[in-house]
Amino acid sequence: MSKTNESLMQRRVAAVPRGVGQIHPIFVDTAKNSTVIDVEGRELIDFAGGIAVLNTGHLHPKVVAAVQEQLTKVSHTCFQVLAYEPYVELCEKINKLVPGDFDKKTLLVTTGSEAVENAVKIARAATGRAGVIAFTGGYHGRTMMTLGLTGKVVPYSAGMGLMPGGIFRALFPSELHGISVDDAIASVERIFKNDAEPRDIAAIILEPVQGEGGFLPAPKELMKRLRALCDQHGILLIADEVQTGAGRTGTFFAMEQMGVAPDLTTFAKSIAGGFPLAGVCGKAEYMDAIAPGGLGGTYAGSPIACAAALAVIEVFEEEKLLDRSKAVGERLTAGLREIQKKYPIIGDVRGLGSMIAVEVFEKGTHTPNAAAVGQVVAKAREKGLILLSCGTYGNVLRILVPLTAEDALLDKGLAIIEECFAEIA
């Protein structure tokens, strides 16, 4: 009996909890570079990239070869029991790639949420404090601490009761939405006045470009002023680069463009070309604050994932993917702005590097238009293009196409997006 998307969806509904959402009713059979083929043999352009995991594309040959070679040596020992060189070599490379003119060390884990959890643990141990300031619209994961840090309730923490204490929320600036950098800094200072003294705050955490929050880049001025506040009060600045890292913004880490260095940086997603790997890199003195046994995990920094990540870094160097990231972003932005001229419901086209978004409003207003975005996503799928939405109100289209995508494929995707807006306008 041949498999269909519908038959597999029936099995999925019966076997998998409904809390595991699924944006597209499609089951993938194979994938290569920037396209996927579903179980019914239909080819689709992938502008989602596994939610920012496939910057080097599906099954990059160099990554596949590195994993195959590692599989002939060792697949697992648990680094805390028997160590292996790929873990150490990768940490050495990450220490050089993360911005900051100071000695660094790196911890490898498995998921982005796990990386953020460990960054908070490290900050607490290093400062002897417990409080953390996060931002409206921020996304940091689905574990309990990271849910508390995440600035959106539905769907992530709805119905789960109170989140962990000691988390405080500041405003994230967006000129489009009427929140200035002054407003954001004032909201941090109000926390110091109304909720917790600075001496009780271990860390301030934010994304250099908000991901789920709508692809809103943090202004450089915000980062500089947060860095100054952290230095003034002995607070650690954590940059959550889970979605922005590994070249998505045109530099290997987005903080390279912000003019300041964070104390701790989290990374995951595209770092290992589709294999589960994440980590925290930071000042050596802070990374060493936790005693032996306080960090790690059974699968953390697996040999397979480390081999994949080392190959990813080589691919970036050999194929000049940072330059390509900028070029992809410029091409997408130019095309989307041409579409914007024709369809006034498109209120903004923005991004950093190739982390590009389109915000959609009700015509002639700044009222979020999630329905239109939902229509575009559905129509694009019918036409052979996979898109994602994001934003606090679900009214933002985001593009996370592999950096290895050819220009012709980018143009085809843009043409489909324009067709979709033409049909709903």
UniProtKB/Swiss-Prot annotation:
CDD domains: OAT_like. The modification N6-(pyridoxal phosphate)lysine is found at residue 269. Its EC number is 2.6.1.48. GO terms for biological process: gamma-aminobutyric acid metabolic process; L-lysine catabolic process. One of its GO terms (molecular function) is 4-aminobutyrate:2-oxoglutarate transaminase activity. Catalyzes the conversion of 5-aminovalerate to 5-oxopentanoate. This is 5-aminovalerate aminotransferase DavT. The lineage of its organism: Bacteria, Pseudomonadati, Pseudomonadota, Gammaproteobacteria, Pseudomonadales. The gene is davT.
